[in-house]
């Protein structure tokens, strides 16, 4: 082997190592938490997801014991401003969606009489979101990009596309630790 061949071989080996190290340190996502509007059915969830370029197989688990906020209110901007003035109003997560805002609530607000009075006074309905957990892959513990997890950049693209859908309230990413 001549000197140039050895240099090329060493360069290729170093480049391969760098690529492998970089790939192993990329942030990966194992699943999505998606909250859909009230009364969205599992077949509708499947139809919605089929319209997006999800690069791996996935399974859908709707309304399991997923504890992220399950309730919401839809209101226009004027109504939101009125709510903020009420002394019994508690600040919560607000999202802008089309011509209205969505106020996401945790289950702790539901039994609160003051909160329910504010809703009734403002003619607003408390709705229960359909919460789905979208598992990437086949459940294997080995996390291989393109098989049972996706890179963060792909997950963010999917999230952004899904959040444009009228039936989708919010999308969260379930990152792989380590």
Curated annotation (Swiss-Prot):
It holds the Pfam family UPF0228. It comes from the Archaea. InterPro entries: UPF0228 (IPR008887). Belongs to the UPF0228 family. This is UPF0228 protein MM_0401.
């Amino acid at each position: 082997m001549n000197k140039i061949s050895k240099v090329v071989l060493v360069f290729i080996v170093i480049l391969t190592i760098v690529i492998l190290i970089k790939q192993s340190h990329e942030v990966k996502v194992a699943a999505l938490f998606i909250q859909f509007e009230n009364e969205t059915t599992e077949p509708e969830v499947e139809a919605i997801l089929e319209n997006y370029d999800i690069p791996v197989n996935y399974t859908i688990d709707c309304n399991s014991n997923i504890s992220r906020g399950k309730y919401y209110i839809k209101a226009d901007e004027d109504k939101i401003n009125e709510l903020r003035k009420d002394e019994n109003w508690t600040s919560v997560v607000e999202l802008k969606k089309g011509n209205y805002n969505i106020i996401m609530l945790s289950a702790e607000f539901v039994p609160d009489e003051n909160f329910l009075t504010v809703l009734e006074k403002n003619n607003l309905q408390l709705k229960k979101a359909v919460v789905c957990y979208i598992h990437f892959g086949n459940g294997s513990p080995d996390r291989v990009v393109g098989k049972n997890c996706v890179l963060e950049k792909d997950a963010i693209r999917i999230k952004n596309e899904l959040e444009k859908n009228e039936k989708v309230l919010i999308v969260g990413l379930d990152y792989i630790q380590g």
